[in-house]
Structures are given as structure tokens and as C-alpha cells.
Amino acid sequence: VRGVLYKMSDASKDTVVEISGKLVEDCSEIRALCLRTQDFLSAVMASGKLSEAQADRTTDMIFIVDNLDRITEHLKDINENVNAIQQSDIKYSNTAAEDLNKYTLKLIDMYETSIIGLVGDVGVDRKKLELTRSELFELRAKMFRAHTKRVQKGKCDASLTAPFGSLLQDLETIASGCMDIADQVEEQHTIEIDLSSDSDEQ
């Protein structure tokens, strides 16, 4: 997921079609991996070898993977959106592209802040997350108002309003997903699961 966000932020006017097309494929692969991970964790739950605490933590992990899957689904939608529009006769403006890049960079910061607890003992900085999310809400509103002004002045085609609005909604949903992950990461650091056979006790 982090790699997809970084590649999105690196895309230029000349490379956006190629990169977005590749990222659609990458997102499909990530979602398939999420599904396999969920299946594995569900099988662990069904093994009957978890303590109550371990079962709770595994449930949290399943929830986190589900959120990663939903985030990836919206990333795929965004890249399909951008790929289709930028290959059409009517394209997003350079200003819109720059604003989308700013939003993506903030999403990277938010995602990394929310997920950091999964790879270490560092706590999640909730204050930073809430501040970034607030900034993203404001940026989304600013971007949409700027788009409508461009339409009003004839600098942007009105037919782009719906896909641009959908794109912004996908971005905001990803931000919400990051907050959901952070909620679980605060409770989920290390899972110790004993999957050994019970045969030694027999």
C-alpha cells in the first residue's frame, strides 16, 4: 500500500497513464494477498489453539487486513479513474494534478503514522493523525471549490466534476481507513500463537 502511494506521488504528466495502469494491476495483487492473509488468520482462529487474548489480537489483525484491503480497493479506483481520464480527450488540469499530489503526500504521512505500530513498539501519534486528517478534510473542500471555479471560468470541463468528486471521496475514505488502522494498532503489537500439535500431551 505504501509503495502504491509513493508511486502515485511520483507520477508526472508524461508518466501518469503508464504508472496508473500499472498500479491498477498492483492493487489487484495486493487485494489478493489480503484475501489470502485473511483466510490464514481465520484458519488460525478456527484451530482452537488460541488463548482468549490471542484470539482477540488475531481478530484485531483480521480487522487491520480488512482495512488494508478496503484502502487498496479505493487506491485501485483512484488509479482507474486517473488512467481513464488522462487517456481521454478531456483531462484533469495541471492544477488539479498538483493538488492531488499534495493530498497523496499527506496520505503517505498519515498511512505511515498509523501503521508504524505494527513493525515496532512505537506508539501511534493520535494527535498527529487527527491533525493530518483535519488538514485533508480542508484540502478536499478547497480542491473541489477550486475545480468548480475553473469550470465556471471555462478552464475545466464540467463533465469532469463527477469523476473528480468521486476521486476526492476515495481519497477521504482512505484517510478514514488509516484512522481505523491506528485504532487497532494501538491495541495490537505482538501476537504469540502456539500452533504446535497436542500430541505430546497424549
Feature locations, PLM:
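Cytosolic, long alpha-helical scaffolding segments
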Residues: 1-202
